[in-house]
């Protein structure tokens, strides 16, 4: 029977890498970040609603959402962040639901890649939650390198979410990503074997 698994973690813990690895085992991925971009793509109803709230500056010269402009506003104004979420979240849910149901109808196991799964209280929309775990210090280092952020900015982003330790305690399974990609792959393979998704190579 097909299962719906929520993959989450903290910022820069390696969720995308885990999703990428899972596709090789036949899982289908429904990505919240991709759905979020789809919700406000050029010419969409969602983008038109964003423009109504944030003004013409919210649209760049290519007719797409000016993410930097909108991002800076919502980071400093919680009320406008809430207004943006009220536009985007229902559209994202609809996109993800359609994608998920399509995969389930064809008998696939589905991975719902949702960075803010616990923050948005979506744990009851999936059969299980798997958290990709790494330490906060590694999160901060990766974020500084990947996004070219200062130490203070990286810490602010990490601490704006529920801590990775708390998420791990709430999860059905924790995938350790304290090492390199090979170790991550081995840890993931072990979980898939234990849960019966794949056969052990030693069998």
UniProtKB/Swiss-Prot annotation:
Xref: HAMAP family: Dephospho_CoA_kinase
GO biological process, one term: coenzyme A biosynthetic process
Name the record gives this protein: Dephospho-CoA kinase
CC terms in the record's Gene Ontology section: cytoplasm
Positions of the DPCK domain: 4-203
Main subcellular location of this protein, as a coarse class: cytoplasm
Highest taxon in the source lineage: Bacteria
NCBIfam families recorded: dephospho-CoA kinase (TIGR00152)
Protein family (similarity comment): Belongs to the CoaE family.
Single GO MF annotation: ATP binding
InterPro entries noted in UniProt: Depp_CoAkinase (IPR001977), P-loop_NTPase (IPR027417)
Localisation: Cytoplasm
SUPFAM superfamilies xrefs: P-loop containing nucleoside triphosphate hydrolases
Pathway as given in its UniProt record: Cofactor biosynthesis; coenzyme A biosynthesis; CoA from (R)-pantothenate: step 5/5
Native organism: Staphylococcus epidermidis (strain ATCC 12228 / FDA PCI 1200)
């Amino acid at each position: 029977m097909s299962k719906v698994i929520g993959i989450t973690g903290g910022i820069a813990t390696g969720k995308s890498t885990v999703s990428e690895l899972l596709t090789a085992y036949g899982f289908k991925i429904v990505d919240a970040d991709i759905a979020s971009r789809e919700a406000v793509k050029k010419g969409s109803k969602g983008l038109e609603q964003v423009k109504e709230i944030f003004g013409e500056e919210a649209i760049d010269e290519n007719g797409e959402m000016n993410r930097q402009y909108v991002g800076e506003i919502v980071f400093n104004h919680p009320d406008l962040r809430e207004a943006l979420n009220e536009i985007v979240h229902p559209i994202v849910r609809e996109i993800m639901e359609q994608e998920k149901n399509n995969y389930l109808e064809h008998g696939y196991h589905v991975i719902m890649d949702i960075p803010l799964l616990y923050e948005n209280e979506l744990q009851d929309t999936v059969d299980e939650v798997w958290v990709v775990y790494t330490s906060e210090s590694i999160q901060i280092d990766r974020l500084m390198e990947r996004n070219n952020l200062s130490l203070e900015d990286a810490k602010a982003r990490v601490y704006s979410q529920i801590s990775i330790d708390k998420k791990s305690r709430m999860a059905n399974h924790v995938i350790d990503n304290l090492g390199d990609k090979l170790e991550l792959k081995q840890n993931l393979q072990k979980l898939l074997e234990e849960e019966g998704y794949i056969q052990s190579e030693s069998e």
